[in-house]
Amino acid sequence: MSKQYPAPPPLAIDAAKRYTATLETSAGTMTAELLPGEAPLTVNNFVFLAREGFYDGVIFHRVIPGFRIQGGDPTGTGSGGPGYRFRDEPVRLGYQRGMLAMANAGPNTNGSQFFVMHADYGLPPNYTIFGKLTSGEEVVDAIATAPTGPEDRPRDPVAIRSVAISGS
């Protein structure tokens, strides 16, 4: 069982700084520029969970080619999270290939689950965008096109080994 938390983390990032997330996965490395100016609460949450090691060993449990790869659920079922929820932030960017956004179960239900866009897709602005890939699109391609079973679950899920955060 993963660590659970009673409440969202206090704001600890500096929205004026640049943050980079390096996701080491069993399929390769993805690097993303986080966007604290667009979504400070969401970036703060992702940075907190990454630094806690929350994502280590977590799989991409839902993959849809031409759409997205989704992970961040410690149970691997699509229904797990960190033990708390936090509010949505306004979405001003589009859901283009390589964007990172929060998965949710409705308004203001963000937790730990996120997705990476495999392709441009016209989603409603209900999923807070908090980052964009700067490298590793071939890793997204490999994950998104892997064979799946029921509920878009990969037959051989890719795991996140670690998420390292750097700031400048």
Residues covered by each model-derived region:
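Cyclophilin-like peptidyl-prolyl cis-trans isomerases
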Residues: M1-S168
